[in-house]
């Protein structure tokens, strides 16, 4: 990651794109307080990523491609576990658990082991758990990998609902059609941000019809490095 600079607004859906090895995962780990940058300045949810990494962790949500769920725990047990980690109180957890299961249509699956859920259901549950504590920002690392297009669209509806509640969404994806769903996107090449704007403006700037065409133009000049 080489001297990247950007700002993300509250409630914005910000796409963080780049090929494997571009530096996306490394940058995200720095923003989440999991890796320490060697230089520069940065704030996440209002907290300094150098001096207040633990505060950063408490005020964010995170979901990886593997969904961050415990397969051998029941649906409600996963919710309770992660809510407890984020310091939520027992009564609040119980109330919000019932609301969440009803909203997702999971009420009948409350006692089902997560490993028995269809992949798309696991995905929706993992995202809902990652924002259960109403974080200021949620980081989604390749969240829709391995699921069908219809399920991906349903997942993005959940993302829009979260953004409407004021939760900032920071998402990495390999699917260029998903880039169109973001308010703004950045594209990393060899550790640097080579483009940052709305999808419409980037397509206009590069004189192309799709975000995939934008990405291909930038990626042609990449020198691949380990992420």
Predicted segments, located by residue:
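Conserved ABC transporter NBD signature motif
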Residues: 40-51, 55-56
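Conserved ABC ATPase "signature" region
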Residues: 80, 84, 91-109
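Conserved catalytic motifs of ABC-family nucleotide-binding domains
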Residues: 134
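Catalytic Walker B motif of ABC-type/P-loop ATPase nucleotide-binding domains
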Residues: 138-142
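ABC ATPase "signature
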Residues: 196-197
């Amino acid at each position: 990651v080489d001297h990247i600079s950007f700002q993300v607004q509250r409630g914005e859906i910000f796409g963080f794109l780049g090929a494997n090895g571009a530096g996306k995962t490394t940058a995200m780990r720095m923003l989440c307080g999991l890796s320490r940058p060697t230089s520069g300045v940065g704030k996440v949810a209002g907290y300094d990523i150098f001096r207040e990494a633990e505060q950063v962790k408490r005020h964010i949500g995170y979901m990886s491609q593997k969904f961050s769920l415990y397969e051998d725990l029941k649906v409600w047990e996963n919710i309770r576990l992660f809510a407890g980690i984020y310091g939520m109180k027992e009564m609040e957890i119980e109330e919000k658990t019932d609301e969440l299961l009803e909203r997702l249509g999971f009420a009948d699956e409350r006692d089902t082991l997560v490993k028995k859920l269809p992949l798309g259901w696991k995905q929706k549950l993992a995202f809902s758990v990652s924002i259960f504590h109403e974080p200021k920002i949620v980081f989604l690392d390749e969240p829709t990998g391995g699921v069908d297009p219809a399920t991906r669209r349903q997942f993005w509806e959940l993302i829009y609902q979260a953004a409407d509640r004021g939760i900032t969404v920071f998402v990495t994806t390999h699917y260029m059609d998903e880039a169109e769903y973001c308010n703004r996107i950045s594209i990393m090449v060899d550790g640097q941000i080579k483009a940052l704007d709305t999808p419409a403006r980037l397509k206009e700037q590069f004189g192309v019809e799709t975000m995939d065409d934008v990405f291909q133009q930038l990626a042609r000049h990449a020198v691949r490095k380990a992420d």
